Design a protein with these regions (language model features):
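HhH-family (HhH-GPD) DNA N-glycosylase catalytic core used in base-excision repair
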Residues: 2-199
């Protein structure tokens, strides 16, 4: 979600929050209630897998504004139901304006659901799979003071995205992977001065 070329133009903190969320009500609510909060539920992890993949090349706010459309289109983020979607259903989604109508991204959500289920079977949960990339098996809490310090990827996201690519996942490179890890609380990048900073 955070990109250096955009971040360089932002204030570090706005109203006591990480400056990337600005003052947009939806963005602020997302920042305060979700971003960086530890996620243990695989259904929520699948939701963010779909949403972060859809965001590739777009703004995160665009995807947040279409989130309910994605929820409807992708069976309330039930990975099993999405994995069973047919080519005909993919075609129907190309006519649904509640999501970004990009055939490759829609098809990747379906194939990624199948790979997600495979990972669950192998590791017991997708969360366990994600944590397998962390040296001590625990989330990372960074202590950045400025948005410009936050990287677009790190060794964990590099290794995880590389492994996911080998497993067949699409639209999930190192930068998208890092955003996913931030969003789901595996990496806490709330700035040290942010009111949502994990204590």
């Amino acid at each position: 979600m955070l990109r250096h070329n955009i971040v360089m133009l932002m204030e570090d903190l706005i109203n006591g929050r990480c400056g990337w969320c600005g003052t947009d009500r939806l963005y602020v609510e997302y920042h305060d209630r979700e971003w960086g909060k530890p996620t243990a539920d695989d259904k929520t992890l699948f939701e963010f897998l779909v949403l972060e993949s859809a965001q590739a090349g777009l703004s995160w706010l665009t995807i947040l504004r279409k989130r309910e459309g994605y929820r409807r289109a992708f069976r309330d983020f039930d990975a099993g139901a999405v994995a069973r979607m047919t080519e005909e259903e993919v075609g129907q989604l190309m006519r649904f304006d509640g999501i970004v109508r990009n055939r490759m991204k829609i098809e990747s959500a379906v194939s990624n659901a199948r790979h997600f289920l495979s990972v669950q079977r192998e590791f017991g949960s997708f969360r366990s799979y994600v944590l397998s990339f962390f040296p001590d098996g625990k989330p990372i809490v960074n202590r950045f003071r400025s948005l410009s310090e936050i990287p677009v990827s790190n060794p964990v996201s590099d290794a995880m995205s590389r492994d996911m690519k080998k497993r067949g996942f699409r639209f999930f490179g190192p930068t998208i992977c890092y955003s996913f890890l931030q969003a789901t609380g595996f990496i806490d990048d709330h700035l040290t001065g942010c009111i949502c900073r994990r204590k």
